[in-house]
């Protein structure tokens, strides 16, 4: 019943990409901690926006059990970074070179891990494949920034939301009522 109510209420929502869309990329990553009650694995969520419009998103259960929120957020940031690097390579094909793409994360601890080139005993257990994010921070491909949880757009990919948060995040992702846009275009 809830699913049908959701579908009925969102059937006219869509993404609108005006012709004068710029090339400013930003990304958001988030995770829950142990959200799957069967195996206690966390969910990584991320989204990438081009000039404030959603162009890529992901929500995936992590392959290992994170033992802290910082670890779960770090793994999610690494997954988001790989998507950012792919988008950068696609834009380079069109001679658009972008560096220092902002990646927003709501975990100060995960951000500190990204900036720390030294492995400490508390992070040695994290699989090596996730540490490539440090290289991209050092090389200036991405910049990790803190974002308040209340402004985290990737929340929609990791957890259920109340209606107010849901509507706020949809607007932040550039989702609009496409019926109203198509009406205004036909009237012009």
Q: Which role fits each region the language model picked out?
A:
Residues 1-2, 14-15, 129-134:
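Intrinsically disordered, low-complexity boundary segments flanking structured domains
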Residues 2-9, 86, 109:
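Alpha-helical scaffold segments in carbohydrate-active enzymes
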Residues 5-29, 96:
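Structured nucleic-acid-interacting core domains from mobile-element enzymes and related host factors
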Residues 12, 32-35, 89:
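Glycine-rich, charged/polar anion/phosphate-binding loops
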Residues 23-24, 42, 49, 54, ...:
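RNase H-like nuclease module associated with reverse transcription
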Residues 29-52:
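Acidic, metal-ligating active-site segments
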């Amino acid at each position: 019943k809830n699913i049908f109510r959701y579908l009925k209420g969102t059937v006219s929502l869509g993404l609108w990409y005006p012709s004068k869309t710029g090339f400013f990329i930003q990304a958001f990553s988030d995770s829950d901690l142990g959200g799957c009650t069967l195996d206690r694995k966390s969910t990584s969520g991320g989204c990438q926006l081009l000039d404030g419009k959603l162009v890529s998103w992901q929500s995936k259960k992590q392959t290992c059990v994170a033992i802290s929120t910082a670890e779960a957020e770090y793994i999610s940031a690494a997954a988001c970074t790989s998507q950012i690097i792919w988008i950068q390579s696609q834009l380079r094909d069109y001679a658009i070179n972008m560096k220092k793409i902002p990646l927003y994360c709501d975990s100060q601890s995960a951000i500190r891990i990204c900036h720390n080139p030294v492995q400490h005993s508390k992070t040695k257990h994290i699989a090596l494949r996730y540490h490539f994010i440090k290289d991209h921070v050092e090389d200036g491909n991405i910049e990790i920034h803190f974002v308040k949880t209340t402004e985290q757009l990737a929340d929609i990919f990791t957890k259920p939301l109340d209606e107010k948060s849901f509507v706020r995040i949809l607007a932040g992702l550039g989702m609009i009522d496409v019926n109203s846009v198509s009406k205004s275009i036909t009237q012009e």
